[in-house]
Amino acid sequence: MAEENAQEKQAPPSAGEQSEPLVTLERGPVSQFLADNGFEHQYLGRDAAGVELLEVERDFLLPLCTALYAYGFNYLECQCGYDLGAGQPLVSLYHLIKLSDGADRPQEVRLQVKLPRQDPRLPSVYWIWKSADWQERETYDMYGIVFEGHPNLKRILMPEDWIGWPLRKDYITPDFYELQDAY
């Protein structure tokens, strides 16, 4: 698997499309470190800011995150979720930073995990980076992604009795919601 990921190529165009040259994506340093150490992932290239983007299967998230923490990625800047559309997977995204003394610019990497809508579960990274606490709770509250092993996974923005996941693209807003008086 590691050899397959060494260089990713775009699929050849179909009969109706114009032929363009195949683009070869060379691994970044983080992806190369993970591949050299046997961690399965897919290298998706770099974003506009030059940050590596990796896709990880949910079963490999914790081992891969533990390896990245040991490699020096000591700060989870952001964990968020998003919906690719009705019938499409949900995504949990992690933006990790390697902060070190004397560095001109911190090293960064983004991980994404695609989850089926019917079973959006994955392990919590709270035990690696404590900054995941409220971020995972917000993602749970808005998208219904369950972070197994989180110490206090409950709604953080919506009322506890709210039904549904408001930021999913297939969410239907209720016509009426009765707020309980706090007194």
From Swiss-Prot:
Pfam families per record: Complex1_30kDa
Residue ranges the record marks as coiled coil: none
GO biological process, any: photosynthesis, light reaction
Gene3D superfamilies registered for this protein in UniProt: NADH:ubiquinone oxidoreductase, 30kDa subunit
One GO cellular component term noted in the UniProt record for this chain: plasma membrane-derived thylakoid membrane
Keywords linked to the UniProt accession: Membrane, NAD, NADP, Plastoquinone, Quinone, Thylakoid, Translocase, Transport
Region (Disordered): 1-21
Alphabetical list of PANTHER family matching this protein: NADH DEHYDROGENASE [UBIQUINONE] IRON-SULFUR PROTEIN 3, MITOCHONDRIAL, NADH DEHYDROGENASE UBIQUINONE IRON-SULFUR PROTEIN 3
Family in the record: Belongs to the complex I 30 kDa subunit family.
Protein name: NAD(P)H-quinone oxidoreductase subunit J
Organism for this UniProt entry: Synechococcus sp. (strain JA-2-3B'a(2-13))
